[in-house]
Curated annotation (Swiss-Prot):
This is YDG domain-containing protein At5g47160. One of its GO terms (cellular component) is nucleus. Residues 163-186 are annotated as: Disordered. InterPro entries: H3K9_HMTase_SUVAR3-9, PUA-like_sf, SRA-YDG_sf, SRA_YDG. Residues 262-407 form the YDG domain. It comes from Arabidopsis thaliana. Keywords: Nucleus.
Length: 415
């Protein structure tokens, strides 16, 4: 007889259902199940699936449904074709981005990201291309091929309209920006000029003397500033007379500013001038770099003044009241014999030749070396008449033009 064990109701196996949360993964056909949907299956205690108790539940019902990357890009204004971007994949819901230096910068939200992408899209449509950030490239040695490529790139950038625009903008920005070193250099010069203004009541002679005095003061001030910056001796000079001439002209301190034939008001025969650039400030000789100064008389060029300087390899000679003057040009002072060329009857040489026919006087300034060999003194020797000219071979074998001038009745100057 078989004994039947009685089972109490408390020990009876009950059918208990529970929800198993499966991890999220890609599903072949995910159109039926959303990205945040979780398939739940009810099982009994025997481990058998209960097909009658299968349903869909939300794992996190309070979270908003994430959008695909394609939909976000479409909202931003991009033309995204189906299947070309994103491939149906969803961006991760969380990204662990380390914040620099543990700052308080918060990551962008979805709405802020959409606005940012829309703004960048708008800028691309306006300017035609995306913004390119500049990178600092360290200098390194280039191979010949890379050097040619870099030179070609530099030429394209140099001639591009954007480069010209940037240079123009930079020049406009720096146009009114004062430079400190120029202000420091001219602070003393301007004070000298302000204290020594020319008066309208002065005679022509007084104006010439006053301008020459101011020229010397400004020259000395520039010479001291240059020696202080260089840390050297004050006796070293490098074309400071040209700088002084430029400053006085800019400040309107020039007298006898118009070219003329004959004598100049305020200047007497025998006047000594320390600098060649000062001859232009007082209107005696305007050609700072040239030895012959000329102007137009009608349709012809005639000479107004010449500067004869000894030691310039031109062979100028003075015999009593006669002067033999060598024409200009031909690179006579060049050490390269191949650079020496024949002089031509143009410019100042032609003006001296025309003065013979026009019978116009020429002012002659003689440059004499100082006793200390520190520069030259320029002495006004008076008016001369050009009598004739001719060609001859110079010491280097090139053709030179020689002019004979004779001094008219004027006070004698002792040299």
């Amino acid at each position: 007889m078989m004994m039947t064990q009685r089972i109490s109701p408390s020990n009876k196996r009950r059918r208990v259902s529970f929800v198993r949360d499966f991890p999220q993964f890609s599903v072949k056909d995910e159109s039926d199940i959303g990205g945040d949907d979780v398939a739940t299956i009810k099982e009994n205690l025997d481990g058998k699936e209960d097909s009658n108790c299968v349903g869909v539940a939300y794992r996190d019902h309070h979270r908003p449904k994430e959008e695909s990357f394609d939909s976000i890009m479409k909202k931003a204004g991009f033309n995204v074709a189906n299947g070309n971007l994103g491939n149906g994949k969803f961006p991760p819901s969380k990204r662990n981005v380390p914040l620099p230096c543990e700052g308080k910068v918060q990551p962008l939200s979805v709405e802020e990201g959409i606005k940012l992408m829309a703004y960048e899209s708008q800028r691309r449509r306006c300017f035609g291309k995306p913004l390119v950030s500049t990178k600092v490239v360290q200098k390194h040695r280039y191979s010949p091929a890379k050097k040619k490529l870099s030179n070609a790139t530099a030429l394209r950038v140099r001639h591009s309209p954007m480069k010209k625009l940037s240079n123009a903008s930079r020049l406009r920005a720096n146009a009114h920006r004062p430079t400190q070193h120029k202000d420091e250099r001219r602070s003393g010069v301007l004070s000298v000029i302000q204290r020594n203004r020319l008066s309208k009541d002065l005679t022509p002679r007084q104006k010439v003397q006053e301008v020459l005095r101011i020229f010397t003061l400004v020259f000395d001030e520039l010479d001291r500033n240059k020696a202080a910056r260089r840390g050297g001796s004050e006796t070293a000079k490098s074309r400071i007379d040209y700088q002084t001439w430029t400053i006085l002209r800019e400040m309107g301190m020039q007298v006898n500013s118009q070219k003329r034939i004959g004598s100049v008001p305020g200047i007497k025969v025998g006047d000594k001038i320390q600098f060649k650039a000062a001859l232009s400030v007082i209107g005696l000789h305007f050609g700072i770099m040239s030895g012959i100064d000329y102007m137009y008389k009608g349709n012809k060029e005639v000479a107004t003044s010449i500067v004869s300087s000894e030691g310039n390899d031109y062979g100028d000679r003075f015999i009593n009241d006669v002067m033999i003057y060598c024409g200009q040009g031909g690179n006579m002072r060049s050490k390269d014999h191949k650079a020496i060329k024949d002089q031509k009857l143009v410019g100042g040489n032609l003006a001296l030749a025309n003065s013979i026919k026009e019978k116009t006087p020429v002012r002659v300034i003689r440059g004499e070396r100082r006793l200390d060999n520190r520069g030259k003194d320029y002495v006004y020797d008076g008016l001369y008449r050009v009598e004739k000219y001719w060609e001859e071979r110079g010491p280097q074998g090139n053709i030179l033009f020689k002019f004979k001038l004779r001094r008219t009745c004027q006070p004698y100057v002792d040299f």
